[in-house]
């Protein structure tokens, strides 16, 4: 094969298929907190289907389970710990400023 045709051939590298995040035996339920907590961000938001790598049906069931857990106060609606940490560390220094005339 000459060099010009060789450039377009791709090497057939094997890739390892990722395991699905929800196994067939896992029950998607609002009481299954270990499963639900995997699909929530650190801020308490529901992660998107693309990030979770779920099917449409699984994502719908996860979303419903998370919302039920929030209503029954098993999960917080928001996790605002980062906001409090940020507000404590910032200090205002208005007294040190001098006005230029």
From Swiss-Prot:
GO terms for molecular function: rRNA binding; structural constituent of ribosome. The keyword Signal does not apply. It is found in: Plastid, Chloroplast. Its main location: plastid. PROSITE patterns: RIBOSOMAL_S18. One of its GO terms (cellular component) is ribosome. SUPFAM superfamilies: Ribosomal protein S18 (SSF46911). Belongs to the bacterial ribosomal protein bS18 family. This is Small ribosomal subunit protein bS18c. The lineage of its organism: Eukaryota, Viridiplantae, Streptophyta, Embryophyta, Tracheophyta. The gene is rps18.
